[in-house]
Amino acid sequence: DVGKKAVANDIEGSKKLWGALVYAVKDAASKRDGYEDADAEMAKALQQVFKDYKHFQVLGTRAEALFKTTHSWVAPSKQLCVKFDFAGLTEDGIGVKLDLQLWNQGKAIVKTDAILKPGSPVFMEGPEWGNGLLLYVLKLQDGKDDKEPLD
């Protein structure tokens, strides 16, 4: 769509999609060595959605510029990653509409449409792993902002 491409070109590089692969477990004994705990803000937000889980570790993060191709990947892991396609701006121009796919070992396991706005992350539930669950956190990030919190 020509209109979509024009809008994308106008704001190319001004926004990024930031993603984190998170390991969620119910007890501290199940945590993995060598990984950082999610910061308090992220852990609190995740615990509100995934109520059975008490501990969250960040396994990897990645930020990818929006609008640079017809589709892009946010891939902190070779096995679990998110493919996203730009589907336009929200009516207020603040957020973006995305077609999201969560991929596990080369297969799409979740497909959804999402609207991302600053301060409103999206959480995607992935497969069970070890004694816990893999989660994917996505947030819209200003292109100049390299911070990772959920603000």
Model feature map: region roles:
Residues 1-151:
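Outer membrane pore-forming secretion/assembly proteins and partners of Gram-negative envelopes
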